[in-house]
UniProtKB/Swiss-Prot annotation:
GO biological process: translation
NCBIfam families per UniProt: PRK00136.1 (NF001109)
GO molecular function: rRNA binding; structural constituent of ribosome
Keyword list, A-Z: Ribonucleoprotein, Ribosomal protein, RNA-binding, rRNA-binding
PROSITE patterns registered for this protein in UniProt: RIBOSOMAL_S8 (PS00053)
Oligomeric and partner information: Part of the 30S ribosomal subunit. Contacts proteins S5 and S12.
Protein name, UniProt field: Small ribosomal subunit protein uS8
Gene3D superfamilies in the cross-refs: 3.30.1370.30, 3.30.1490.10
GO annotation, cellular component aspect: ribonucleoprotein complex; ribosome
The family this protein is said to belong to: Belongs to the universal ribosomal protein uS8 family.
Organism listed in the record: Ehrlichia canis (strain Jake)
Biological role: One of the primary rRNA binding proteins, it binds directly to 16S rRNA central domain where it helps coordinate assembly of the platform of the 30S subunit.
């Protein structure tokens, strides 16, 4: 099965896993997904993730989802820039997600980072997704 948008598939897996109260979900491997998972871990939205492999060529991530008092920590996670309509912004025009309570994950020339770090570094880029 070919995926036209693996990032959207990854975000949907997280959303569905949290709605069904799963402790662990399995998502496909890519460098972009790895970078997004590192940001989600550093910001406290997930408990952790590990890289696994079925064979030498098939890799995937096991993601430990985080809950607080029985409720999912991630209340909203959405794809912003889509394959059919890309969304770019400069560092000075970068919006804040829920007035700074949430975060945007941005693909910049210096790598994938949160909106706060992109503003701090003075770089803009493609807004991949928003997390609240």
């Amino acid at each position: 099965m070919s995926l036209s948008d693996p990032i959207a598939n990854f975000l949907t897996s997280i959303r569905n896993g949290q709605l069904s109260m799963n402790k662990v979900i399995v998502v496909s491997y890519s460098y972009v997904i790895h970078a997004i998972l590192q940001i989600l871990l550093s910001e406290g939205y997930i408990d952790g993730f590990t890289e696994k492999s079925k064979s030498s060529s098939i890799k995937f991530f096991e993601v430990k989802l985080k809950y607080y008092n029985g409720a999912p920590v991630i209340s909203q996670i959405a794809r912003i820039s889509k394959p059919g309509k890309r969304c770019y912004c400069s560092a000075k025009d970068m919006p804040k997600f829920y007035n700074g309570l949430g975060l945007y994950i941005i693909s910049t020339s210096k790598g994938i980072m949160s909106d706060y770090n992109a503003r701090k570094a003075g770089v803009g880029g493609e807004i991949l997704c928003g997390v609240f």
